[in-house]
Amino acid sequence: MFTMKKSLLLLFFLGAINLPLCQEERNAEEERRDGDDEGSVEVQKRFFPLLFGALSSMMPKLFGK
């Protein structure tokens, strides 16, 4: 009986440790996935003003105004 309690206690302990580790890994993966979306938005924010600035400086040269 004592060995059965001991092994059940060990299983409970290992399960209790394993659960938070899995949750941390899942949260890190979700943050990594969410971070990719934010990075692409930031790249778009940086790219479009540069593109519009370059086009506005080239337009007068192209049309001779």
UniProtKB/Swiss-Prot annotation:
The entry's keywords? Amidation, Amphibian defense peptide, Antibiotic, Antimicrobial, Cleavage on pair of basic residues, Fungicide, Secreted, Signal
Where on the chain is Phenylalanine amide found, per UniProt?
63
Q: Does the keyword Signal apply?
A: yes
Query: Which InterPro entries does the UniProt record give?
Result: Frog_antimicrobial_propeptide (IPR004275)
GO cellular component, as recorded: extracellular region
Q: What start and end residues bound the annotated signal peptide?
A: 1-22
* Propiece residue ranges: 23-44
From the UniProt record, give one GO term of the biological process aspect.
defense response to fungus
User: Which tissues is this chain's protein expressed in?
Assistant: Expressed by the skin glands.
Q: Where in the cell is it found?
A: Secreted
What role is this protein assigned? Has antimicrobial activity against Gram-positive bacteria S.aureus ATCC 2592 (MIC=2.5 uM), S.aureus ATCC 43300 (MIC=2.5 uM) and B.subtilis (MIC=15.0 uM), against Gram-negative bacteria E.coli ML-35P (MIC=30.0 uM), P.aeruginosa PA01 (MIC=2.5 uM) and P.aeruginosa ATCC 27853 (MIC=2.5 uM) and against fungus C.albicans ATCC 2002 (MIC=5.0 uM).
Give the record's family classification. Belongs to the frog skin active peptide (FSAP) family. Temporin subfamily.
The protein in question is named: Temporin-LK1
